[in-house]
Every structure is written in C-alpha cells, then in structure tokens.
Amino acid sequence: MKNAGSVLSLLCVAITCATSAMAEQITFVSQGGVYQEAQTKAILDPAAKLLGITIKQDSVPDAWPMVKAQGETGKPVWDVIDTPPSNCLRGGREGLIEPLDLASMPNVKGMPEAYRTPYSVAYEFYSSVLGYNTKSLKKVPQSWADFWNVKDFPGSRALRNDPMGTLEAALLSDGVPRDKLYPLDVDRAYKRLAQIKPDIAVWWSSGGQSAQLLNDGEVDMLMIWNGRVGAVKKDNADVGFTYNDGILQNTQLCILKNAPNHATAVKFVDTAVSPDLQADLPKYIDYGPGNPAAFATGKLSAERAMELPSSPENAAKQALMSEEWWSSAEGIAAKDRWLKFVQ
C-alpha cells in the first residue's frame, strides 16, 4: 500500500506538472505573410524563449469576424491578436476584449498614452506618406499642400481609394495643424478632395498597386505606405518620399475576453512591447517599433532610425491617426460617404 501511495503521489505530481505546462502557452494571431515572419524572428520566438512558453500562431487578414464569433461562444480559442486599434476598441465596448491590466504590465504602462487604448497597446507603426518621382518632376512636393498645388507642382497624381488617411491629408493640405485634426471636419475634407479629384489619375486600392504606379512612372506623386515606397526606392533611384505630413498608424495587441490562457497572454503582451524586442523588428521589415523606448536601446543606428516612421524625429513630422475617432459614429458616417464621392 505504501508503494501504491507513492505511485499515486507521483502520478498526481506528474498530472499537476503537465497541466501547468499546458497552461504556459498562447495562441497568437496576426495578418500573415512577410510581416508575421518578421514578427516571429524579432519578437515571437524570443518572447517564447524568455517566458518559457509555447506560442501557437494563426493568421487572418481581418480578425474582427472571428473575434465576434469566438466571443459569442464565451470560449474563444485565441488569446492575443495583432489588429487595428479600432477592432480592439470595438471589441472592448462589446465585451469581447479584456481591458489592459496596467498593474501587471510595466512595459505597457511606460508607453505614451497616445500609443494605447484601454484595451490595447501599439505593436508596430507604419505611415501613409507622400511619394514622388524625382526624375519626372522639376521640383518635388514636400507636403500635402504641395500635392494639392497643381499649378506649382504639375504632374500626374494618385491617392488611396479609402477615406482613412485620405481625409486627413486633405485637411492638412488646407492648413489644419497636425495636432488639431480631430475630430475631423468631414465636410471641409470632402470639399478639399473635390478640388483635387479632377487631377487624380488613379485611386489605388492595394499596396502593390501603389508601388507599381510609382516604380513604373505611371504617376509622378502619390500617397503610399512607407514600407512600399521604401522597397521601391531600394531598386529605383528615381523614387523618393517624405515623412513630412505623413499619417502615422499602428496595429495593436489585445487579449480576448475569457482567453483560455489569460495570465500567460498578459505576460506575453508586456514582453512583446519591451524595448529590446521592439528594437529588433526593423531588422526584418520596414515597420517602426510600437514602443518609442526601442530607439534608446542602442540597437538601432541613427541611419536606420531615420528610415522608420515611428522614430522620434519622424513621428514629430506626422499626424497620429485617431482610430478612436474613426470607430465613432462620425467616423463610420465619413466612411459611408466615401463610396459616393469616388464614383
């Protein structure tokens, strides 16, 4: 009986250990492609090693429908998602996303308030910038005011077929200060866009299309994502861009309500935005760290920092998009108005 008791005790210990080990894992969801590959190398694998956990990965272009579906069951299978802040805000308001536990997240707490919501924290940054062809233009535009000035800056133009970022550019071109954009004056923005509409050769709908337009010389200037124009610039010496008047955007990390591995998810999110891991992301992709403290680690050269949208110098030249405004009733109405405008 004594031996039997010992065996039983060992079994209990083994089961307890196995259960504990199983709990030390999360399912992380992002958008896939080279972006998720870069995250895996810079952040996910190192975070897993630091925390001694397993990170299972999934990818989906738009996480919101699945967040909604999983939330309705009350038993989601995902733990952490990398998604636009508007999804985190909407999910938080609908009881599908957990509020941030700042007391348990020192790295998150130390980040600028503008870089987080009550439910999420900035993970990486990208920008909608003004790109141009230096060969075809006698002088290159350096602001959206220049882009709208067709008399002094003649040439073919393209804008993104989406109101987010485009309405901000219109208002910046009309003299609205970067820090006074929100709430957007939607009527003023659409009026300003109507002025430039006859001079827009292409309303592009994908990052690949915008890059091709610039690389092939189909347009002389356009709105384009910094990662796309940066890639074109490496192979085409005639291409340039400016961060001045850029529209700075980010994706954020948030934790699903009733996540199966909530405690581990909290530890992961805080580790994922630590300055050291954040500083490694630009080694693999032209996105900026979500945590500005990454630029003080010494891991990013001054030259590399100047190429990134979220460096202190470049961020100061740009307007930070308010996803909270875009997820409001006014923002949704502005989006609905877009389809009629571009027809």
Locate the predicted segments by residue.
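Conserved C-terminal helix/tail region of periplasmic/extracytoplasmic solute-binding proteins
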Residues: 314-343
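Early extracytoplasmic/lumenal segment of secretory-pathway proteins
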Residues: 24-90
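Periplasmic-binding protein-like
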Residues: 110, 125-128, 187-196, 233-259, ...
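A bilobed periplasmic-binding-protein/Venus flytrap-type ligand-binding module shared by bacterial periplasmic
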Residues: 129-136, 171-176, 250-264, 269, ...
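Sec/Tat signal peptide C-region and signal peptidase I cleavage site
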Residues: 17-23
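A ligand-binding cleft/hinge motif common to bilobed small-molecule-binding domains
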Residues: 86-90, 215, 220-238
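Mature extracytoplasmic/periplasmic domains
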Residues: 256-318
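Extracytoplasmic ligand-binding site segments that recognize negatively charged/polar headgroups
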Residues: 33-40, 76-215
